[in-house]
């Protein structure tokens, strides 16, 4: 059932207060999300390559337990490694007409986790700074039976869940997202290699006044002394201020970098590896960014952890992606839309292209005419009809999940 309604509420951009957060690439929660998702992708590709279908799995319960480190200007060492536990459930043996085939679960999990760390960090060594472990409930599958049921049919929802999307992003939401992406960009790291990957951004707006708090871990061995640290910190601040002047010129923006620093007491945000996980900061899948890459308490949000869930039938993942696609298309293609929210609810056991309800909330100028309703409904139906394509987008890394 598709419901389209005009709602009478103040758009976020016009509210007095707005709060937006993003946990960046090296944050412990982001690490958990990233590893969960890569394990799912490695499993999915293995299943596809060897059995022609993606078999059941959900690995959306990764835990990152902080280690201990002793950073110092010009050096430092990791004293106790970060402990990463990947948990969930996956198919580990498959019965075929030729016999039982075992899936190398452990090898795939370890390889996925190591590869993710290597690709997203420059100074975190997955072999010496991290202990990777896994506790995955093991299931089996009857491939002959699966084919008899028809693997090409529309998957059935394996949960009763909700996915949420909205559009457009406010200037503050864009600024928070782009700030983290800037500081973790290849160009910025080439210019300022001292800046680590653990970047967290919190934006608070009251009227036209914005305070942007940026926590950026610094790489201790690349920072020779206090003055060097403060110089890089000032360069980070200026870079963010320059970005802010382009993304949100209508606001008065104050940028604060590493607010917990107390130089007079020798307290600086230094890390050996580039992540706060090296010294007691823990993380877990689903505790960080929502599927659009932001934490937005002023918006409707799903609390589902999209990362690590199977990309075929788990609506906690798929519906968040589809809801965002519908919201973006409605905002971009339908005239006079100010804001749009989309909520999609599944019913366990039903085909994923038959949601229990697909609700579209519209804030717009003027009336919600029959023509507008038809346009919105056509967009929603098209995306739901194409829902099985989402799996490929996810496996190719073409959609935001965290």
UniProtKB/Swiss-Prot annotation:
Pathway: Amino-acid biosynthesis; S-adenosyl-L-methionine biosynthesis; S-adenosyl-L-methionine from L-methionine: step 1/1
Cofactor: Mg(2+)
Name of this protein: S-adenosylmethionine synthase
Keywords associated with the record: ATP-binding, Magnesium, Nucleotide-binding, One-carbon metabolism, Transferase
BP-aspect Gene Ontology terms: one-carbon metabolic process; S-adenosylmethionine biosynthetic process
Entries under PANTHER family matching the protein: S-ADENOSYLMETHIONINE SYNTHASE
Binding sites annotated in the UniProt record for ATP: 137-142
Gene source species: Pyrobaculum islandicum (strain DSM 4184 / JCM 9189 / GEO3)
GO function terms (MF aspect): ATP binding; magnesium ion binding; methionine adenosyltransferase activity
Highest taxon of the lineage: Archaea
Keyword Phosphoprotein: no
Family: Belongs to the AdoMet synthase 2 family.
Function of the molecule: Catalyzes the formation of S-adenosylmethionine from methionine and ATP.
